[in-house]
Structures are given as structure tokens and as C-alpha cells.
């Protein structure tokens, strides 16, 4: 049986196995605390995420079960990888993942990104989304703080707690407002993987213009900002709105023509970047570009390699997600998943980019390491 050490971190009890030493807080959210630590077995730094009180309610337990299942299934070099999981004596759940030095939100708050970094980062985001979407999974909460980056320019998408199956009926309130697709705000009952492409488009725009594109103060203000730039929703979009009040609101808006997106980014922005942005920020999700097709766009040509942009082995098994079990049942299922993970030989982390491919990232890595050093991030 594993031995545990108890520490006090930011006023919170942090229990971890003796495999890990020197926990240091790096993040705190509504669902848990994240600390950096050193893994004495792998001799590598890790991020230890504490999921607090996962068995307090059936909804929390189900969310935790979903996240564990997704982390076990989704394995791709642009997604965060689970390296260990354990349940503490106080019955909190701890998940160890690789530790990356910073996140995109922190970088963007410090200094502007060079255009070549923006280009490489959106490529990796779309590469990860192609894989996620091929597994029939929608991330639903893509934002700069969920994009982790290390000094080698490696990018990984994290936080799958809100991820969902693409299905006919979907709940509406997800994603941080700035990056939320308009079909979610318009209370559609059905939306799909295109919401992640919209979020990625908002992130690309923010990297290019050095500030958020749609910094809405509330739901209504957010929608006004979108229509001020992209114009009024077409009839095909309005017809899919299920709320009469929302339909009346949309129809009451003054007529607005879409602006050229070249007017909302710096004048020296690459034409191909603007062209891709136009395809990602299409109001009608049925005509919005997919992650897979976006990877083929000229803007990403320096990195695009169809032989090195993998898809999932098959769709993720969502059969549990419609279940309405009591928290005790979810607890048993979580314990089973943890034991299953610990009792099998888990595959190694996904391999880094193959240096034999046409793109050699070494020069970009050196420049980005200097960028991080100048920014005080390493």
C-alpha cells in the first residue's frame, strides 16, 4: 500500500504519495488545486492536480469519472498526458501529468507574441483538435489558459472536465465567454465540434492582435461584439434557435454588415493568417472550417504533414454519459478506473515531432526559449 505525505498548500490539505517531493502551488480553480512536484521514479517534474471532494455529489463524481476516462483514452502529443493517478486517505483524487512551464494566457498577458510563434501554436492547437474531434469528443472549454507550453515550443491542450460527446441535445453554458461560439449563446440545443474551431479562431485572433477579439462584459454584450465585426446571423442560423426570446432579440438588432477581418489585426499580418481566421470565425457552424481542413491551409504549410497528424483509433465510448447514477455508484466506477490504470502497463508518452519530417523546430525552439527568458517565464 502506498505511503502518503500530508502538506498544507494555500490553506488546503495536499496528500500525495512518497513517489513525489517538493509540491509547489501553480494554480487554483473551482474544482481543485494544481502543484508542481518532482517524480522520484521517472526523475521528471510533474503537475499534480488535486480534485477536491469528488464524491460529494453525483454531478461532481460523474464529471470526475468523465475526465479520468478521457485522460486514459486520449493520447496525443498535443494533449496533456496522464502519468499517474491515486486516491488519498481523505478520498481526494490526484492526477499527475507532465509539467509544462507556462500557458498561453500568461504569455499573452506579458508581451506580444512574434508571428512565427502564433503560427506554430495555432498549428499545434488544430492538430490536437483534429485528434480530439476524430474521437467524437468536443473539448468545449478551449481558451488560452488551457493551452500549456514549454520552452521547446511544445503545446498541449489540457482540462477535459467539460468535454462532451457530439450529440443531438447539448446544454448551453460552457466555455469562457470571450471564446464561446455564438451557437452556444443562441441557445441551440444541438452543436458540434465546430464550437472548438470557433474558440481556436478567437485564440488565433488574440495572438495576432495582442488582445481578445470579443471581450464581452456579459452575454448580450458578447453577442453585440460578434455582430459588430462579423455581421448579423444569416437566416439559416436564426432558424436553428429554439428560444423565442432569443429569436426576437436577434431580429431586433440593427442591420450590420460584416467587416473585413484585416481591419481588426495589425496591418503587417500575414494575408494567409487572415484568410484562415475568416474560415474559423464563420457565424454558421455548418459552413465553418473543420480542424482537419484548417491544417491544410497555406498559413500552416510550413508545418503541415498529413502523415504526422494522427486521428484517434476510434470513437470514445460515451455510453456512460447518459446515466444518472447515485454518487456511490460513480464512486465505485472511479475506483475501478483508477485500479485499472494502475494495474496495466500504460503506453509511453506520445513521441515528440519526428526530426526527420520536413519541418525542423530547433531554430524556433531556440528563439522561443529566448522569448521566455526575456519574459521572465523561465
UniProtKB/Swiss-Prot annotation:
Residue numbers of Phosphotyrosine PTMs: 173
Regulation: Activated by tyrosine and threonine phosphorylation.
Catalytic reaction equation(s): L-seryl-[protein] + ATP = O-phospho-L-seryl-[protein] + ADP + H(+); L-threonyl-[protein] + ATP = O-phospho-L-threonyl-[protein] + ADP + H(+)
Documented EC number(s): 2.7.11.24
In-chain residues carrying the UniProt-annotated modification Phosphothreonine: 171
GO-annotated biological processes: carbon utilization; cellular response to oxidative stress; osmosensory signaling pathway; stress-activated MAPK cascade
Protein residues bound to ATP: 26-34, 49
Key words, A-Z: ATP-binding, Cytoplasm, Kinase, Nucleotide-binding, Nucleus, Phosphoprotein, Serine/threonine-protein kinase, Transferase, Virulence
Cofactor(s) needed by this chain: Mg(2+)
Post-translational modification: Dually phosphorylated on Thr-171 and Tyr-173, which activates the enzyme.
Pfam hit, one: Pkinase
Presence of the UniProt keyword Transferase in the record: yes
Disruption phenotype: Germinates poorly on and is unable to utilize polyalcohol sugars as sole carbon sources. Increases sentitivity of hypha but also conidia to osmotic stress, oxidative stress and cell wall damaging agents. The double mpkC and sakA deletion completely abolishes mpkA phosphorylation. Affects the cell surface and the extracellular matrix during biofilm formation and reduced the adherence.
Domain of life, per lineage: Eukaryota
Quaternary structure and partners: Interacts with sakA upon osmotic and cell wall stresses.
Domain note: The TXY motif contains the threonine and tyrosine residues whose phosphorylation activates the MAP kinases.
Protein name per its UniProtKB record: Mitogen-activated protein kinase mpkC
Native species: Aspergillus fumigatus (strain ATCC MYA-4609 / CBS 101355 / FGSC A1100 / Af293)
Amino acid at each position: 500500500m502506498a505511503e502518503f505525505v500530508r502538506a498544507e498548500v494555500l490553506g488546503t490539505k495536499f496528500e500525495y504519495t512518497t513517489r513525489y517531493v517538493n509540491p509547489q502551488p501553480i494554480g487554483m480553480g473551482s474544482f481543485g488545486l494544481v502543484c508542481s512536484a518532482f517524480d522520484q521514479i521517472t526523475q521528471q517534474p510533474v503537475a499534480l492536480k488535486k480534485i477536491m471532494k469528488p464524491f460529494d455529489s453525483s454531478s461532481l463524481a460523474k464529471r470526475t469519472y468523465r475526465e479520468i476516462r478521457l485522460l486514459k483514452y486520449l493520447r496525443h502529443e498535443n494533449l496533456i498526458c496522464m502519468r499517474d493517478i491515486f486516491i488519498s486517505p481523505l478520498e481526494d483524487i490526484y492526477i499527475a501529468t507532465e509539467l509544462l512551464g507556462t500557458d498561453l494566457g500568461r504569455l499573452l498577458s506579458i508581451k506580444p507574441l512574434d508571428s512565427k510563434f502564433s503560427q506554430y501554436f495555432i498549428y499545434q492547437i488544430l492538430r490536437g483538435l483534429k485528434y480530439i474531434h476524430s474521437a467524437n469528443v468536443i473539448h468545449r472549454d478551449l481558451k488560452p489558459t488551457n493551452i500549456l507550453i514549454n520552452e521547446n515550443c511544445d503545446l498541449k491542450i489540457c482540462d477535459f472536465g467539460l468535454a462532451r460527446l457530439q450529440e443531438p441535445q447539448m446544454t448551453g453554458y460552457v466555455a469562457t465567454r470571450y471564446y464561446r461560439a455564438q451557437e452556444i449563446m443562441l441557445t441551440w440545443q444541438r452543436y458540434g465540434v465546430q464550437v472548438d474551431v470557433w474558440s481556436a479562431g478567437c485564440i488565433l485572433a488574440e495572438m495576432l492582435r495582442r488582445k481578445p477579439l470579443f471581450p464581452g462584459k456579459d452575454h448580450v454584450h458578447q453577442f453585440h461584439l460578434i455582430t459588430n465585426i462579423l455581421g448579423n446571423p444569416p437566416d439559416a442560423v436564426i432558424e436553428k434557435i429554439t428560444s423565442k426570446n432569443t429569436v426576437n432579440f436577434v431580429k431586433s438588432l440593427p442591420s450590420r454588415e460584416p467587416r473585413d477581418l484585416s481591419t481588426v489585426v495589425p496591418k503587417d499580418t500575414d494575408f494567409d493568417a487572415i484568410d484562415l481566421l475568416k474560415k474559423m470565425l464563420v457565424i454558421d457552424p455548418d459552413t465553418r472550417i473543420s480542424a482537419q481542413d484548417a491544417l491544410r491551409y497555406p498559413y500552416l504549410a510550413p508545418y503541415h504533414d498529413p502523415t504526422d497528424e494522427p486521428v484517434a483509433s476510434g470513437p470514445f465510448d460515451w455510453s456512460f454519459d447518459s446515466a444518472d447514477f447515485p454518487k456511490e455508484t460513480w464512486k465505485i466506477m472511479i475506483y475501478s478506473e483508477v485500479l485499472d490504470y494502475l494495474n496495466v502497463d500504460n503506453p509511453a508518452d506520445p513521441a515528440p515531432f519526428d526530426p526527420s519530417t520536413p519541418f525542423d523546430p530547433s531554430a524556433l525552439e531556440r528563439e522561443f526559449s529566448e522569448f521566455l527568458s526575456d519574459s521572465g517565464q523561465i
